[in-house]
């Protein structure tokens, strides 16, 4: 296991630096620029050249990085690995100022399908992006991560709920998931730190627009923490997208250092494997490549993907269109260019990379007897006859063949007939674009908990699989065959 530890430590460093999708995208943006990738803007014309590498972001929470093969021609395919940057959490509400029996609380909204009971009695904080007014009157989006524990959702003592261990822990997501941030003892601090009000009630003002100010909608103590972290005044804070997150760092654990205990394994785990896999592709390989190698990390998978930065948006088609237009518009007629875009879609292949369920030692009956992935035994191909996953015989064979040729362990998974099945961006993309797709992911335990578990060795296995996919897919014999 020791040989896998360096890569696992890099991964947990990434996790700790990525408390929100915005931070994850910023992390990858900095790495890509340091590795020679050119930062594109979707608001400007692109100048795409063969054997060059590029990336762009959308909404600060979605990123697409691609390397153009040195032998790329009109109609050639995109070899894509797609994952997502978001995880279930609590979002701070637009009006978050809540008070109850002497406590100041922060109103939050559930995002995705989390195991919300795991958020009780944790040391919590906030992270995300804040719209800040600059001295020249312009506005800027700044990332923020308050690293100390400022929030807590306390559980109810067993003395006040004697049946909790027999009847189960029951909670209401509206009433019982409201983090406390301070007590009313902080009221003198509020009146001192803001000029808008001297009480916790809404300020009296003759300006009707003041009811929409940040100091009216959020507790002053929260705004003060944000302003201190951002280096601005409270009045400069215009709006924000903040998520609640755990302050406990990710860690390598187990007696033999086999496990990673971490938040957001789903799906920063496969986001990391996909992007590092692309970065590890050799320059000599890219020079001889006939396709475009592309990693896309979408946002909003946990809530259906229906956003400009989600997998339902036409980002893949937009990218293919702009790359082909930039490279070949001067030498092709318009109708030929449209045909080449269609050909590119038909010649493309996509790995939908999302974490998978490992066999649980305490709940073995919940798993299909012949499909029980284990931690540290390699990535998992995910199947579902009802198309909750996009894998089929030919597309899964691509992965099996790559793994066999490169000594990468691989596993297979499907749910029991009497069990519901989750889904991924795989069926969305394959159904929208007709791109051949396979669903894979590293195995993990406690999916959608605030604290999840995955395998140390699987980080390396996942990276190796994505790298070899990018380096070898175009030349696989099956792609030249008539399996359509």
Curated annotation (Swiss-Prot):
Task: Tell me which EC number(s) this protein carries.
Answer: 3.4.11.21
Protein location: Cytoplasm
Single GO MF descriptor: aminopeptidase activity
Chemical reaction(s) catalysed: Release of an N-terminal aspartate or glutamate from a peptide, with a preference for aspartate
Q: Where does Zn(2+) 2 bind?
A: 266, 302, 448
Q: Is Cytoplasm one of the keywords?
A: yes
Cofactor(s) listed in the protein's UniProt record = Zn(2+)
Query: Which residues does the record list as N-acetylmethionine (modified residue)?
Result: 1
What's a single GO BP term from this record?
proteolysis
Record's keyword annotation contains Zinc: yes
**Cofactor remark from the record:** Binds 2 Zn(2+) ions per subunit.
List, as start-end ranges, the regions of compositional bias called Low complexity: 188-206
Q: In which residues is substrate bound? A: 159, 301, 354, 357, 382, 389
Q: Where mainly found?
A: cytoplasm
Q: Where does Zn(2+) 1 bind?
A: 84, 266, 354
Cited Pfam families:
Peptidase_M18 (PF02127)
Biological role: Likely to play an important role in intracellular protein and peptide metabolism.
Entry similarity comment? Belongs to the peptidase M18 family.
Cite the record's note on assembly. Tetrahedron-shaped homododecamer built from six homodimers.
Q: What is this protein called?
A: Aspartyl aminopeptidase
What is the scientific name of the source organism? Dictyostelium discoideum (Social amoeba)
What lineage does the source organism belong to?
Eukaryota, Amoebozoa, Evosea, Eumycetozoa, Dictyostelia
């Amino acid at each position: 296991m020791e040989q896998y530890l360096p890569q696992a430590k890099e991964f947990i460093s990434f996790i700790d630096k990525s408390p929100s999708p915005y931070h994850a995208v910023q992390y990858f943006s900095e790495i890509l620029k340091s590795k020679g990738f050119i930062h594109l803007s979707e608001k400007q014309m692109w100048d795409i050249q063969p054997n060059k590498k590029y990336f762009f972001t959308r909404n600060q929470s979605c990123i697409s990085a691609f390397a153009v093969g040195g032998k790329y021609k009109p109609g050639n395919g995109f070899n894509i690995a797609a994952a997502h940057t978001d995880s279930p959490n609590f979002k701070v509400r637009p009006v978050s100022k809540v008070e109850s029996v002497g406590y100041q609380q922060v109103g939050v909204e559930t995002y995705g399908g989390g195991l919300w009971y795991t958020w009780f009695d944790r040391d919590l904080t906030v992270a995300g992006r804040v719209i800040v007014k600059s001295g020249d009157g312009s506005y800027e989006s700044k990332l923020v991560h308050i690293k100390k524990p400022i929030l807590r959702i306390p559980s109810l003592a067993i003395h006040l709920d004697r049946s909790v261990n027999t009847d189960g822990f029951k909670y209401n997501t509206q009433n019982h998931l409201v983090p406390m941030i301070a007590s009313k003892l902080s009221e003198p601090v509020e009146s001192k730190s803001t000029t808008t009000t001297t009480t916790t009630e809404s300020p009296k003002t003759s300006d009707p627009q003041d009811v929409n100010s940040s100091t009216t909608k959020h507790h002053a103590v929260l705004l003060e923490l944000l302003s201190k972290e951002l280096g601005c005044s409270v009045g400069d804070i215009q709006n924000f997208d903040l998520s609640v997150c755990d302050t406990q760092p990710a860690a390598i654990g187990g007696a033999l250092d086999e496990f990673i205990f971490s938040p957001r394994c789903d799906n920063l785990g496969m986001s990391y494997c996909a992007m590092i896999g692309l970065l590890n592709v050799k320059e000599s390989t890219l020079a001889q490549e006939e396709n475009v190698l592309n990693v896309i990390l979408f946002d909003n998978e946990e809530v259906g993907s229906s956003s400009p930065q989600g997998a339902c948006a036409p980002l893949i088609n937009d990218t293919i269109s702009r790359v082909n237009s930039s490279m070949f518009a001067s030498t092709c007629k318009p109708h030929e260019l449209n045909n080449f875009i269609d050909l590119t879609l038909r010649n493309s292949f996509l790995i939908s990379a999302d974490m998978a369920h490992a066999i649980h030692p305490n709940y073995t009956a919940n798993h299909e007897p012949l499909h029980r992935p284990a931690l540290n035994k390699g990535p998992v191909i995910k199947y579902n006859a009802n198309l909750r996953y996009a894998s089929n015989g030919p597309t899964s064979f691509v992965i099996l063949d790559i793994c066999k040729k490169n000594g990468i362990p691989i596993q297979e998974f499907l749910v029991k007939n009497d069990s519901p099945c989750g889904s991924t961006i795989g069926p969305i993309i394959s159904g929208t674009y007709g791109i051949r797709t396979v669903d894979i992911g590293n195995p993990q335990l406690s999916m959608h908990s605030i604290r999840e578990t995955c395998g140390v060795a699987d980080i390396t296995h996942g990276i190796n699989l994505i790298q070899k996919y990018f380096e070898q897919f175009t030349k696989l014999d099956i792609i030249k065959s008539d399996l359509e």
